[in-house]
Regions:
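Cytosolic regulatory regions of ion transport systems
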Residues: 1-149
Length: 149
């Protein structure tokens, strides 16, 4: 069981938090939007309303105690960038950040992200491989260059 912080409870963040819980992990979900936090209360271990671009708020979360921090903010790149940097500044051991474009990924990596995820792109590629070919039922991506079909 891992302890995970999920920042941003839009579609991606909410699904990520729910799946992490389903897999037996503890999840603290954070969003600046009170309605999103209230909607997630039954899905996660704990949920808080807060601005993750605020240093005092990040410090209060004890981010160094989480195994994984997921920055799932998709609609505000500046907030995503600041949150990623603050998480690393306050001791987060591993930060997975969402990017919508390659230029976003470049800045997120420079500011502390350990891994970048492109949810829409990655799912589109996976579905194109699965449904665009008659003989492939599923595949596992081992690295960006190698997959098992």
């Amino acid at each position: 069981m891992k302890s995970v912080l999920v920042v941003g409870l839009g579609r991606f963040g909410r699904h990520m938090a729910a799946k992490l819980i389903e897999e037996g992990n503890e999840v603290l979900a954070v969003d600046i939007n009170e309605e999103r936090v209230n909607d997630a209360l039954d899905l996660v271990t704990n949920a808080q309303i807060g601005d993750t671009t605020n240093e005092h708020f990040i410090a209060s979360l004890g981010v160094g105690n989480f195994d994984l921090c997921v920055v799932a903010i998709g609609d505000n790149f500046q907030s995503s960038l600041e949150t990623t940097a603050l998480l690393k500044d306050y001791g987060a051991p591993f930060v997975l950040s969402r990017a919508n474009r390659d230029v976003h990924a470049k800045f997120l990596l420079r500011n502390g992200a350990d891994k970048i995820v492109y949810p829409e792109r990655e799912m589109a590629e996976r579905l194109a491989v699965k449904f665009g070919t008659d003989n492939i039922f599923d595949y596992i991506e081992l690295t960006p260059d190698y997959s098992i079909y």
